[in-house]
Design a protein with these regions (language model features):
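Nucleotide and nucleotide-moiety/phosphate-recognizing core
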Residues: 1-146, 151-168, 180-184
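A broadly conserved detector of short glycine/acidic/proline-rich loop/turn motifs that flank catalytic sites
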Residues: 177
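Dinucleotide-binding Rossmann-like beta1-alpha1 core, especially the glycine-rich loop
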Residues: 171
Length: 186
């Protein structure tokens, strides 16, 4: 199994590349890649071609540019030719406990995504290599909504236990306001 940081988003609501925003004095991309490396030694970055050359992880260019997270996940599967743990670059509080929980509960025959408090996180999951051709078909038919793909492919939703302190793990940073709130609450 390989691990991939999804960093190809437009970051339009943030107004700057989220992957490069500093979090605890490190770019978010590097922060997430380092966490992934604690659970899997084969870590890659999926995103815009050449955008992250300064980082010490191999890069995966999008096979189908501008196709959102689905395009990044497909590109990762095609590059790695293996089951792939994916994590977005904008979830700074994700940790090895959450990732180990996902790994311990995953079914190798289908897509596995984490669910927390009845919210599904399609970019935080394990995608088996055997779904690559199906993902390609969705992309070629311009069906890019991950929720539709997950439903069509009967993805397993792995419910992470809800406790008062675990909500933060699933926080996404999408806007400058999100960043300010998390900076002050961290």
């Amino acid at each position: 199994m390989k691990a991939v940081v999804l960093a190809g988003g437009k970051s339009s609501r943030m107004g700057q590349d989220k992957a490069l925003i500093l979090f605890n004095e490190k770019p978010l991309l590097l922060h997430i890649a380092n966490i992934l490396q604690e659970v899997n030694s084969k870590v890659y970055i999926s995103g815009k071609k050449g955008a992250y050359n300064s980082f010490p992880y191999p890069q995966i260019a999008d096979v189908y540019p501008e196709k959102g997270p689905l395009g990044g996940i497909y590109s990762a599967l095609e590059y790695c030719k293996d089951d792939t743990l994916v994590c977005p670059c904008d979830m700074p509080f994700i940790n090895t406990y959450v990732l180990h929980f996902l790994l311990l509960n995953y079914d190798s025959t289908r897509i596995n995504v984490l669910e927390f408090n009845e919210q599904i996180f399609p970019t935080l999951g394990i995608y088996p290599y055997n779904v690559a051709s199906a993902l390609k078909t969705f992309i070629e038919n311009d069906i890019l909504q991950l929720q539709k793909v997950l439903t069509a492919l009967n993805a397993q939703k792995i419910a992470y236990p809800v406790h008062p302190n675990t909500k933060k793990y699933f926080t996404n940073l999408n806007t400058p306001e999100d960043l300010k709130i998390q900076t002050f609450s961290n």
